[in-house]
Regions:
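P-loop/Walker-type NTP enzyme "switch/lid" segment
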Residues: 1-71, 172-173
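Residue-level signature of catalytic and energy-coupling elements of molecular machines
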Residues: 6, 23, 46, 79, ...
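A generic structural signal for short coil/turn motifs at secondary-structure boundaries
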Residues: 53-56, 137-140, 180
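Conserved phosphate/pyrophosphate-binding and hydrolysis machinery centered on Walker-type P-loop NTPases
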Residues: 55, 59, 88, 183
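Short, conserved glycine- and acidic-residue-centered signature motifs
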Residues: 58, 62, 108, 186
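Conserved catalytic-core segment of NTP-binding enzymes
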Residues: 64, 68-71, 75, 81-164, ...
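C-terminal boundary of histidine-terminating zinc-finger modules
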Residues: 172-188
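A short, charged, Gly/Pro-tolerant segment at domain boundaries
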Residues: 192-196, 205-217
Length: 217
């Protein structure tokens, strides 16, 4: 429902034949529209429709699709559009809990605070926080908001932290999910988030500065 590019990030764009609109219009079945990841047997993507504005979709159909998916899957993630507009409201209609992803800058935090308020008003009270693109050098220089300050300002449980790293861009361009890229220490961030989401008690991954930042920072 968001930027409609998850197929690229997963490296499966060439295998997409149908999308969610095809399912809604009865062109194909839900099972045929789902694209299975070649590396992970239990990871599937239901592609968004790239040719139509997401706000024009009748989301009562999305709710029916989610009901069907819940019969087969333990976790269903709905990628919400950016901003607080109709697409966002439609996306959360089918959600029972939410993960709010925020950068540690004041603008992003303010937007996230509004989102959390809306989620609460829609009775989505199980809301967790992921802080993205954390740059430890900027925090050390006091030019970026600390992780603790973000948690205090938003006042929801922290699910995990993703540190700013070139591996994120590299893996996105290669269509490799960082969660399965074992060569990257950012992999541990994603793995720990998934474990905490599943109820496991694991510590947050500590970030690291580059050697140049440590020597000359």
């Amino acid at each position: 429902m968001g930027l409609k590019n998850l197929d690229i990030m997963l490296g499966i764009e060439s295998r997409v034949v149908f999308d969610i609109l095809d399912v809604i219009n009865g062109v194909t079945t839900l099972n045929k529209a789902l694209v299975k990841d070649k590396r992970l047997d239990n990871l599937f993507l239901l592609p968004a429709c790239k040719s139509i504005d997401v706000t024009k979709i009748n989301f009562s159909y999305l709710e029916k699709i989610i009901v069907e998916l819940r019969k087969e899957f333990d976790f269903i993630f709905i990628d919400s559009p950016a901003g607080i507009e109709r697409g966002f409201y439609n996306a959360i209609r089918s959600a029972s809990e939410a993960i709010v992803v925020v950068n540690n800058d004041i603008t992003s935090i303010r937007d996230a605070d509004k989102v959390i308020g809306i989620l609460n008003s829609q009775s989505i009270l199980d809301t967790k926080l992921v802080i993205n693109k954390v740059n430890l050098k900027k925090i050390d220089e006091s030019t970026s908001i600390t992780i603790d300050d973000v948690i205090d300002l938003l006042n929801i449980p922290l699910l995990g932290v993703i540190y700013e790293d070139d591996d994120v861009i590299r893996c996105n361009n290669l269509g490799i999910p960082l969660a399965i890229e074992s060569k990257s220490y950012i992999n541990k961030c994603y793995c720990n988030i998934s474990k905490r989401l599943n109820g496991e008690d694991v510590r947050l991954v500590k970030g690291k500065m580059s050697i140049f930042a440590r020597l000359f920072g």
